[in-house]
């Protein structure tokens, strides 16, 4: 059942660094990495495969586990947990088991087109047992359509691609805390037992040295009351806690003599106002902590409790509810902690370290991945269904009951639908480019249901923690209110079955690094001594030096003998995320700027022609392959057919594969998704080779921007404050041109007055306006359109009015044709232009699935080619962002001695105070990659001799126009850069364009004179960001007004006006511009009568009349009158002013001019 496209996910092979057909990159890396970066989408794929129990997941688990071990999927776990559902008498029961899926209903493309879910039907086996008659009835029950994950780790919900973000939450377990009492300055200790589901149990020691307990955050009571309620006698408590004066003192003053009194006391505190009985008190306590239906520690909670308290040998098995031993050991641990003891004997007889817990440590925070989040929703739905089943068992005739008659699947499907559609963790996928999609799927969020809220989250939880190392990136996080609450999974990290993030380390034995790699959680890592990846080693992996810099518990760096080291990092980039690992010379950038660089790479728009960076980090290839936008060969073989739409390959095993390419599709962010073939018919291909490029990739490598020739210099003040000066060539040759696609949708509905109609027959529309519409009234593909042009003609019936004799005659002659309709056509929104590239028509007549009341729906796709222009935002990869301030003709740009004009001029002031020196080093290395270099190993130059100590041999001779890689924390050194600049290849004239410092004497394009000082020139990778001026610039003539205040609306989306605010008014007052100020406050704003009279005066050529009373003044009066204040307006001579007197004039003026300027916000901006 689970074959086919449901889990195309699991069939993807893991990619190695030796990807066939890839562009050669000359890498400066010195460190050999023992393992590859794991699959970058495994976080999503593996979790969902566990949830649905995919065959590949089962096979993998069986291979890893002991023979005969039972393997259950996420859905099977829930059904086991829920079953059996018994009626109140226990005579009838219903058991659910064996969840299974049919094939998916629609393909991914069909789901997107029809605005439906990409899902598969879920069935379970339901077995009803009647204990009285011994009868068993079994049926297969349809539970609902279950959204399935695509091969890219996304979901298609209502036609849009969404991502379920993994949630970082506090793990269930037992947590000890220390606080300082403000009055006595003594340390006070407390402990919380936090379950996955159920009531919290808290113990604390207060300043009066009594041990108390809070159940479910209610009132505090002596801990011995709880112990007696659990059935312990005073003697039992004395035997267990006789060593503690605190416990003995608490026992003495607890005021209860036996178990019954203790139970009643707890009931009174928990349920004040209710009369307690012993049975109800016992039931309350049992349900709170010992009933699996009400209280659940989960596997991870039991694991954490056992590890912390030394129970069960630290195993993961055991009850998922609390046990008496759990409670006793927790109290003992607390009193010993308060007494200042450092160790205690655990119930297992082992020695247990006593310490408080750090709640921000990654040993105490775990991930809820997509599988667990969906599983929790299914659990919620099933528990609602359970109540319905119980009720039906009692109301239906026992003889006629069948499983299908008991089960109502609506609560389950509703819970799943609600989660995927509206949950804070189900997010509209960021498809701006390949990297943004990949990063979105690897995002970790501490927000969401059961997590933190940004208002309550303090600095501690947002801060970088030592345990984040190799697990969560310390760089990549948003800049706004979510800073530190949303992170990104580190490149080598993976998630273990308990949800804790693990990172790999090389095992070190007797000072020698082996190739054995262990994945450690943050807790396990704290028990070991870990060396850095760049620790100096000989060819056999032995540490060269006797002492090594290592990381100890808490992130402290110390120097220890080499023989004491347990592990070392597998790679220098294991601490950062994928996006951060793509910043060359990251080690030379300030963290704040690196954060901006990592975030802004995700905002880069795919360009018309993509170009991989000259200076990369080696991560570009792997990121592009794993993002899923590059088409990859499934098996080795030969290319049979290549065209723009598909590629066919014939494998060596005789199997034929067809790869459909996606052409000019719109992404969620309006960028263009287009795939282009890289191979030709007859080419030999290998498994894993890139067959076609996606958006923002070149030859299978991530390519988000262009390599441009950059000079660092001020230029006439035009690049002041991060402004950027561009060469006109960039515009003319479409170097930074991108395609943006907008989708416009309109539907024809049934209205009370009759059906709307999509038609070419539009009232009062000339043939010129209709020229590009076809006979159906829909714009033709290929038409160039601009704002205000009709895309789809539509008429809506008007309300019938009294007909004139002439109209009655027309109605009699032409029948219904002359009926009153109004034009409700879909027009191109204000400020948009482009070319129509696609039209989709959905009609009820063609059996398309449309919403109720909709007869026809039309989607029109308009593509726009946007060249770079003044006001667009550009950025490098080091947080060096800026706005295009001026585009100069190529002849005015400064040029190199060989006549090459520079493409970009950046201001030097943007470097020193921001401390992102990486951009300057990238500039120099980019120039070297462009020119190539040849190193003379025999050279006596000190700079070259220093370089040869570290430079890999395969980098001695590099041709021009090469691609280089400088991995983060393991890249080009300053000595290497300095030596290579002395070894760069001359151009064809035999000249070297830059000197040994990477500088060149530039010549002013306007005067032909050289600039006074040499200037740093080189190639930098520049990105065009999504903040385009075309989408921001806006101007209003007349438009919609707010219904209450009658002032113009604000914002481009509402076709609003520019707010002339309080501070601007002060400026007018300062200049004494009284008349301008009066106009702004009245006829240009909310003087409803005045603005119509002004229009009339302009039309008739009269003088502008005096302003009237602003509407907001009338609103203020009404507000005061609503507070029972009798406010009247008096004229200068003391006579009352009638504020409604002008309304009649207004109506007459409107009628005579045939205008309506008093629009309200219900009017659509497009209709203006």
UniProtKB/Swiss-Prot annotation:
Disulfide bonds: none annotated. InterPro entries: DNA-dir_RNA_pol_bsu_ext_1_sf, DNA-dir_RNA_pol_bsu_external_1, DNA-dir_RNA_pol_su2, DNA-dir_RNAP_su2_dom, DNA-dir_RNAP_su2_hyb_sf, RNA_pol_bsu_bac, RNA_pol_bsu_CS, RNA_pol_bsu_protrusion. Coiled coil: none annotated. The keyword Zinc does not apply. GO terms for biological process: DNA-templated transcription. Pfam families: RNA_pol_Rpb2_1 (PF04563), RNA_pol_Rpb2_2 (PF04561), RNA_pol_Rpb2_3 (PF04565), RNA_pol_Rpb2_45 (PF10385), RNA_pol_Rpb2_6 (PF00562), RNA_pol_Rpb2_7 (PF04560). Its EC number is 2.7.7.6. GO terms for molecular function: DNA binding; DNA-directed RNA polymerase activity; ribonucleoside binding. One of its GO terms (cellular component) is DNA-directed RNA polymerase complex. It catalyses: RNA(n) + a ribonucleoside 5'-triphosphate = RNA(n+1) + diphosphate. It is an enzyme of class 2 (transferase). It comes from the Bacteria. Keywords: DNA-directed RNA polymerase, Nucleotidyltransferase, Transcription, Transferase. Belongs to the RNA polymerase beta chain family. DNA-dependent RNA polymerase catalyzes the transcription of DNA into RNA using the four ribonucleoside triphosphates as substrates. The RNAP catalytic core consists of 2 alpha, 1 beta, 1 beta' and 1 omega subunit. When a sigma factor is associated with the core the holoenzyme is formed, which can initiate transcription. This is DNA-directed RNA polymerase subunit beta. It comes from Corynebacterium kroppenstedtii (strain DSM 44385 / JCM 11950 / CIP 105744 / CCUG 35717).
